[in-house]
Swiss-Prot record:
Similarity section: Belongs to the UvrC family.
Species name: Staphylococcus epidermidis (strain ATCC 35984 / DSM 28319 / BCRC 17069 / CCUG 31568 / BM 3577 / RP62A)
Residues covered by the UVR domain: 199-234
GO cellular component term, pick one: excinuclease repair complex
Name the record gives this protein: UvrABC system protein C
Length: 594
């Protein structure tokens, strides 16, 4: 039994049978999972006994220590769990800070308010309405309101009247004193309209349409008629879910094979305008997973808390109330209960449709890294960092690093490097510099170390990297090299001090993963190098010499590698590089005078 396993076993004996939260830590003392439990000892022991699904097995395999915090109640545990997840952002927790941002219409909280479409919700900065099903829907509604209510349009107050004032869509607060009561009245009418009360705005438009008709301004009357029709269309587009206009979110969920799907219906003005589905691998009871989910849904994500939240009857209303500060409803009959049933059914369908794909993808990527670890004789490389260099004969040399976690790209940990200490095209020294910079910073900042480092290259690259890691930084991390064939395709994985070929079948999941990693790091490095070249434009003394354009400049740099080497070249060597006599003389004179 490993030493850490003995310590964990001893520690489990003193964990109390009380509610609380626990923090699982890896070999780098990083928190990788936060959970809660009614009885801490039972929950923690369950991780280290019996069989688990693939995800929990991987989690347990990484645990080297744990901590726990006792709380006075299950509700307090939930609140603490949410705060700990925010603080540590563990990778095995379901963090709902994703890219599911929806558009809202906002009335700013300013002396002279503005009407905006935004995907960012900030507390105490104004009134928000939505979410809208898409940006087009929100923008069309805003355009309609802009034509009726002359709110300020400018971000900053200008010192003169703008076009919007002259077309009647602004009251010109930059120049004139505007009655603030007028703004208050407009804000109320817009609020009523966006909350489903459209009678006032329809009456205004009908009055304007009739007045325009009486004045024989039929073009203007038609415009008002179209606006009225647009409002009617807005209220008819979505399926009617309720006869009242209360702003509510309706939650349902389904559980199958260790996964939970939570379905949310956004109901506005009696219509279901949007729905959201989230897949969650279950680490706790289904009720506990739901409490964690709904707490994160409103605290970590940009979701407005509605006037009502509807949830299934089997859940503890008081626990949900502790993390969602609004009215919690658990319908037992009628149309509102039907909405809960519909959300549950949609969650079940979503789970059935996607579970097989998720399981297949999970199996494929996990199988790939497990196979890779077995073939190399190392522990399963959960975290892989790969490096590649890019330059044109030493010009604007750069390097890039990509990170794969659980066999998938982890793009927030990608890094770009400009080579600082190497002159000319020297791949080995460039790789040494970048690896030295990367892992010096990792050590200084306590960042997670990789389980495997891959370099795009052979034995020379590998030896240089291992020398830096072992002899300069004192690190023992497996280093492998990826080589390509004549067609520039991934062909071999090299490993060990003698850079031996690791036997991998070309059709294996492990080989496919390596191919993907090599392509990704190459793409990332090439893109960065291209961006760097575009910024510098290969600016040099060559730009000012008659007879040397972009093509000749690039050709010279490829031939000689640097301006310094060109300066050391003889006249004949410059001529042999393809320069006409006059141009070669111009270049030599320019470089000698430099």
């Amino acid at each position: 039994m490993e030493e850490y396993q003995k310590k964990i076993k001893e520690k489990l004996n003193v964990v109390p049978l009380e509610p609380g939260c626990y923090l699982m830590k890896d070999r780098n003392d990083q928190v990788i999972y936060v959970g809660k439990a009614k009885r801490l000892r039972n929950r923690l022991r369950s991780y280290f006994t019996g069989a688990h699904d693939a995800k929990t097995t991987r989690l347990v395999g990484e645990i080297r220590n744990f901590e726990f915090i006792v709380t006075s109640s299950e509700t307090e545990s939930l609140l603490l769990e949410l705060n700990l997840i925010k603080q540590y952002q563990p990778r095995y927790n379901i963090l709902l800070k994703d890219d599911k941002s929806y558009p809202f219409i906002k009335i700013t909280k300013e002396k002279h308010p503005r009407l905006l479409v935004t995907r960012t919700v900030k507390k105490n900065s104004g009134k928000y309405f939505g979410p809208y099903p898409n940006a087009y829907s929100a923008q069309e509604t805003k355009k309609l309101l802009d034509r009726i209510y002359p709110f300020r349009k400018c971000d900053n107050m200008p010192d003169k009247l703008c076009l919007y004032y002259h077309i009647g869509q602004c009251m010109g607060p930059c120049v004139y004193d505007v009655d603030l009561e007028k703004y208050a009245q407009m804000t109320k009418e817009i609020t009523d309209f966006l909350n489903g009360e459209d009678k006032t705005i329809l009456n205004h438009l009908e009055e304007r349409m009739n007045k325009a008709s009486e004045q024989l301004d039929f073009e203007q009357a038609k415009e008002y008629r179209d606006m009225i029709q647009h409002i009617h269309n807005l209220t008819k587009k979505q399926k009617i879910m309720s006869s009242d206009n209360t702003i509510r979110d309706v939650f349902g969920y389904s559980v199958s094979k260790g996964w939970m799907c939570v379905q949310v219906f956004f109901v506005r003005q009696g219509n279901m305008i949007k729905r959201d589905a989230t897949m969650i691998p279950i680490q706790q009871t289904e009720e506990e997973e739901f409490y964690t989910f709904i707490g994160q849904f409103y605290s970590l994500n940009q979701h407005l808390i509605p006037k009502e939240v509807h949830v299934p009857k089997n859940l503890d209303k008081d626990i949900i109330q502790s993390v969602v500060d609004t009215k919690i409803v658990q319908p037992v009959r009628g149309a509102k209960k039907d909405m809960i049933n519909l959300a549950n059914h949609n969650a079940e369908v979503q789970l059935d449709n996607k579970f097989e794909l998720i399981a297949r993808d999970e199996s494929r990527t996990i199988k790939a890294i497990e196979e890779l670890g077995e073939r190399m004789g190392i522990q399963t490389p959960i975290r892989i960092e790969a490096f590649d260099n890019s330059n044109i004969q030493g010009v604007d040399p750069v390097s890039a690093m990509v990170t794969f976690v659980d066999g998938k790209p982890h793009k927030k940990d990608y890094r770009k490097y400009k080579i600082k200490t190497v002159e000319g095209p020297d791949d080995y020294k460039s790789m040494r510099e970048v690896v030295r910079r990367r892992y010096t910073r990792v050590l200084n900042e306590g960042l997670p170390l990789p389980d495997l480092i891959i370099v795009d290259g052979g034995k020379g690259h590998m030896n240089g990297v291992m020398d830096v890691l072992e002899n300069e930084l004192g690190l023992d991390i497996p280093v492998a090299g990826l080589q390509k064939n004549d067609k520039h395709q991934t062909s071999e994985l090299l490993y060990g001090a003698s850079a031996e070929i690791v036997p991998l079948k070309k059709n294996s999941q492990a080989f496919y993963l390596l191919h993907r990693i090599q392509d990704e790091v190459h793409r990332f490095a090439i893109t960065f190098h291209r961006q760097t070249r575009q910024k510098t434009g290969l600016k040099s003394v060559l730009d000012d010499i008659d007879g040397i354009g972009t093509k000749r400049k690039t050709s010279l740099l490829r031939t000689f590698g640097s301006i310094k080497k060109m300066k050391e070249a003889s006249f004949d060597e410059l001529r042999q590089a393809g320069l006409p006599e006059k141009v070669a003389k111009n270049l030599q004179n320019a470089l000698q005078n430099k």
